[in-house]
Amino acid sequence: MYIRKSKLQYHAKPEKSNPIIARRLQEILGGQWGETTGMLAYTLQGWNTVGNEKYKDLLLDTGTEEMGHMEMLATMINDLLHDAPTDTIEKLARNSDPATAAILGGMDPQHAFVNGLGAGLSDSNGNPWSANFIISSGNLLADMRFNVVRESQARLQVSRNFLQTEDKGVRDMLSYLMARETQHQLQFLKACEELEEKYGPVVPHGTQDLQKQGKEFTHTLYNFSEGEAAQALEGETARDGNKFHYSSDPIMAGGEPDLTAAPEILRNTPPEDPSTAVEEGRRMLEGEQNTCLLYTSPSPRDAHES
């Protein structure tokens, strides 16, 4: 269950209105690596973690914190849009020529048209947030590695936003978010370290016997480009304790493919006698229909009568 507190987790008050900054913050709220992604990814991972209370609590605590970050960003965006030039936005809605669009000066029109001068779950270009951004695989190590990437990308974008604004209030909030994302990176890295020690560095563990190939495939870096800079890995130790090898000539062990061509009619190649094209197409369609009939399940009524 969740209990809502009326106070924000941290300050979220700009010095003055600025719809351009509001648009930039949308990336941190509803972009691919934003707080919405963090909140829902960690929460779903936590719900799906059964039998490991340590990591379950870690994920759910962090996911709940991210919800507070979403609230802070939505609050900040609302304040930044206060006194936004709605008359200019209305003109843009009626006239899509480039000159009118330029008047907008970088503001996100969806803030007015869709959200009524409020925040939305979309990125800085108005693309809607998608559940495709999150990962919850059931494999803790794989998920924790995704979480490290998510926090790294999020902190990268927050720091860039920080450097592109002079508003002290916005900077104060962004500085706080960077600090928390530092903690989250470190905690997920620690979780990865613990899980690797227990299960090994390769996901999923326990599948080595499924690999028929030897180390010429599992621990060899192939050179697929000009230059030999990657040769520096030769002899280095991988995280599983084995040595890396370098091959300047990639192995070609599969042979040349031997495929059967599709019927000419399917490749848009007309038959030798064009007059037979219609009849040939009809035969193909009838064959498809007959095939479909073979796999059609009986209706409940037919099943009952039989």
Predicted features along the sequence, with ranges:
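Alpha-helical bundle segments that constitute or directly flank the non-heme di-iron/ferroxidase center
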Residues: 18-51, 64, 68-72, 137-165
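Inter-helical turn/loop segments and adjacent helix faces that build the functional surface
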Residues: 48-54, 160-174, 195-198
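Acidic/His metal-coordination segments adjacent to aromatic residues that form catalytic metal sites
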Residues: 13-31, 94-147, 214-228
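Conserved alpha-helical segments that form or flank metal/cofactor-binding pockets of metalloenzymes
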Residues: 2-4, 63-117, 188-195
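Alpha-helical scaffold segments in carbohydrate-active enzymes
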Residues: 58-79, 150-153, 157, 173-194, ...
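Conserved small/polar residues in nucleotide/adenosyl-binding loops
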Residues: 295-300
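A contiguous, mid-protein "functional segment" used to position or interact
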Residues: 172-239
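C-terminal accessory extensions/subdomains outside the catalytic/core fold
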Residues: 211-294
